[in-house]
Amino acid sequence: MGNWKLLPNRSWVDSLILMKKKTKTSATSLKPPAFLLDLLNARSPSGYEEEARDVVRSNVEKYADSFVVDNLGNCHASLGKTGSPTLMLAGHIDELGLIIKHISDKGFLYFDAIGGHDRSMISGRRVDILTSKGTVRGVTGKRAIHLMSIEERKRVPEFHQMWIDIGASNREEALERVMIGDAAVYDHGFEILNDSLVVSRAFDDKSGAYAVNEALLRLSKGSKPSCKVVAVSTVQEEIGTRGAISSAHLADPDVALVVDVSHATDHPDADHRKYGRFCLGGGPILTRGPNIHPGVFERLIQCAKKEKISVQIEADPRPTGTDARAIQVARNGVPTGLIGIPLRYMHTPSEVIDLGDLEAVVRLMVTFARSLKKGEKF
């Protein structure tokens, strides 16, 4: 079992941890992959994923045996034209966004949310508005705290109490630049915090989309797996796992692995009794629960042991809030596993991950794919 150790009074599967000091990837060997940076730079709120889709195509199509964009906009990159089993790897390329709902007489843009925002984090952010004429810069605003009563200061503003300022003098001037239904994203780019810890908007789930496609690229260059592999960059996950519903029908997998971010709880104000203990740099988070096929989970554990990859185990008693919930029940059911990338500050403009965890996720998927035997069923 290498450096695996057991925590006292727990079953091995609940406490399987690889000693971090012996397995953590050297920070000096970790460089942000250009593919990942391109995905993060792409603006792709749910339903408006064109920029991210173009990035996936330009990085993956030349390595795939086939590359298909379905009617909803999911990208399907396949390795192996036929094969049993078919392994689906899924990560979503959409991100949180804002959508313009109203333009006032004074030229201010009122908006609603695409996806689940923390309203307390919205005001004072620079945003890019995606229009048919190009990008329009703006800043989110609300009434200054100095102009609020004591009671008003205690309340989080509703969406209709905030706006985007693009510097327009009136409605007509604003309409020359934007229109109702245009989407916007925060302008918060990639930065290195310390060693392998990095911050950006939209690691949820550009990091997962990078991981599934990078796994396919590595499988294309090394020894080919016995199975067919389909890396799917799904869309509209943030508004109800919609892309996963349609893509699972086209991919028609025998087994699936979904990669999404998962809450790291190694920060203040996280109750481990309620949320569990998960840390950046601790390795991929593997979920157990009704949404997860036990055989797929066990195979992931075996692959992690083989590659000496540290893993963290999460229990979820409900359908997870990921594409796994949709893929598991597609067609006549799909044995599904869920791999989490530990992340701090989810659904904010500044999400933090460890690049070492991301690399471990890619390695784990590559090993899983190569472990599948021809005709194998779960």
Describe the predicted segments one by one.
Residues 2-4, 8-378:
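N-terminal hydrophobic/helix-forming segments and targeting peptides
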